[in-house]
Amino acid sequence: MTIVNEGAENVGYFTPAQKIPAGAAIGVPQTKLFTPLKIRGVEFHNRMFVSPMCTYSADQEGHLTDFHLVHLGAMGMRGPGLVMVEATAVSPEGRISPNDSGLWMESQMKPLRRIVEFAHSQNQKIGIQLAHAGRKASTTAPYRGYTVATEAQGGWENDVYGPNEDRWDENHAQPHKLTEKQYDELVDKFVVAAKRAVEIGFDVIEIHGAHGYLISSTVSPATNDRNDKYGGTFEKRILFPMEVVHSVRKAIPDSMPLFYRVTATDWLPKGQGWEIEDTVALAARLRDGGVDLIDVSSGGNHKDQRIEVKDCYQVPFAEKIKDQVNGILLGAVGMIRDGLTANEILESGKADVTFVAREFLRNPSLVLDSANQLGENVAWPVQYDYAVKGHRKLR
């Protein structure tokens, strides 16, 4: 008998084939968390996804580095249903910091392609979040002291834009008010970045419409006092994100899932900002525009926000949208710390997937720990499998 250590296909180096993705249930899944989910042409082997997390570690031209290959690759090897690359700017002034990811020029594709190639060599799914920071752009990395990044620091404090000229706070640059033409041009930039993401080979694209960045600040009456086609009524305030959604959906394959991260509420007093009722109304329009899944976050749009932070504090927002809007999938995110909790969210019908961020940084083997909590038998990388249950004959 000849034993061959079969290699992964379509990769320029040897790495063992992972015929069963790490994190996939072996046999019939016993829980919703480990039940595969198919969205358009992509099947996710479980429903615990890695949220996009900014690391402020790209070079000053927006290129990802070997740090990101290791950071994202290591999380992907440990079996989440999807790894989402951090907020990636569609234009240079759309970065949060000088060290943010970008996809506004072709040279930025090469390091991203390496990351995607590695994820696929491990039989894992990977997506990218496309973003514009708006009035929250040109700041320093928070772990270096959160303030305005000056030109001497690689910033662009005189080239920051938002729906109006109001600063987020004293630690942010004074923005210029975007013209209608500039909004129109940004729609095109989202499309160009999306086409590049498709060419690179990403499985999913997410549009960042949350946390006070450009889309979020444009839709909220607390931060948009415009009186042109992009301001005033609810329909006018959501015009920009809907143009982005429609244009991106047309530019990417029908088989490719499109996600949208939303701020469910500004966490301001009633009547003063964007509220969950607005998100419910937007969700129906996003569905009709071709969005497949809404990733439900909150806050980040106004300095006077009063967020009631606790475990799973944003899950009720996802649940409310799910109860009121049919035909679109919902993702819950925020302080989801373990598999028991994640599975309960899904089993009770509050959401269709869970997004987890900081807990993956604390515990890269969260998927395996969750499986053990729930009594699920899941695959693990062939190189690591003997550390889990001995040399199992799984593949």
UniProtKB/Swiss-Prot annotation:
GO terms for cellular component: cytosol; nucleus. InterPro entries: Aldolase_TIM (IPR013785), OxRdtase_FMN_N (IPR001155), YqjM-like (IPR044152). It comes from the Eukaryota. FMN binds at H208, R358. The active site is at Y213. It catalyses: A + NADPH + H(+) = AH2 + NADP(+). Substrate binds at H208, Y386. It is an enzyme of class 1 (oxidoreductase). Keywords: Flavoprotein, FMN, NADP, Oxidoreductase. Its cofactor is FMN. One of its GO terms (molecular function) is NADP binding. Its EC number is 1.6.99.1. Belongs to the NADH:flavin oxidoreductase/NADH oxidase family. Homodimer or heterodimer. This is Putative NADPH dehydrogenase C23G7.10c. It comes from Schizosaccharomyces pombe (strain 972 / ATCC 24843) (Fission yeast). The lineage of its organism: Eukaryota, Fungi, Dikarya, Ascomycota, Taphrinomycotina.
